[in-house]
From Swiss-Prot:
PROSITE patterns: ARSC
Superkingdom field: Bacteria
The protein's name in its UniProt record: Uncharacterized protein MG127
Swiss-Prot/TrEMBL keywords: Disulfide bond, Oxidoreductase, Redox-active center
Disulfide bridge map: 22-25
Similarity comment: Belongs to the ArsC family.
UniProt cross-references to Pfam families, sorted A to Z: ArsC
Length: 145
């Protein structure tokens, strides 16, 4: 149970999930640097993606796991005769920890001031990444009278 008043550690942050040798990841970081947008880098090859972060990513995915996994994910089906779509969330998390190269990179996820995931982009696209130049619209508090 969370303590009252304790702020979510993801609140107001943008995370760029990368692998060190990924040129698309470096382009995303350059974009954020050039536009003076703050971010936190998480190298998921060195430190596995947390269960919470992975679930947040899934919650923002418009097409389930399809856009998250690279074409290499087809190898899973060939070797295990099961597709990524058939795996449970816990099985997906285990798979990503064992084989991080299956994920497309970078994964950019942005949280609002309450720590709720609001925006995500997977892969680098020079026009789509510009969405992060805009401020998140925060909900106005409801005032009861």
């Amino acid at each position: 149970m969370k303590k009252a008043g304790k702020k979510n550690s993801d609140a107001g942050k943008t995370f760029i999930l990368i692998s060190s040798s990924c040129s698309s990841c470096q382009k995303a970081i350059e974009f954020f640097d050039q536009n003076k947008i703050s971010y936190v880098v998480e190298n998921f090859y060195k430190k596995p993606i947390s269960d919470k972060r992975f679930k947040d990513i899934l919650s923002l995915s418009e097409d389930g796991t399809e856009s998250l996994f690279s074409k290499r994910a087809d190898q899973i089906k060939a070797t295990n005769s099961v597709s990524v779509e058939e795996l449970s969330i816990s099985e997906l998390i285990k798979l990503v920890r064992e084989r991080p190269s299956l994920l497309r990179r970078p994964i950019i996820i942005q949280y609002n001031s309450s720590g709720i995931p609001k925006r995500m982009r997977i892969g680098y696209n020079s026009s789509e990444i510009k969405v992060f130049e805009r401020k998140l619209i925060e909900p106005k508090p409801i005032i009861q009278q």
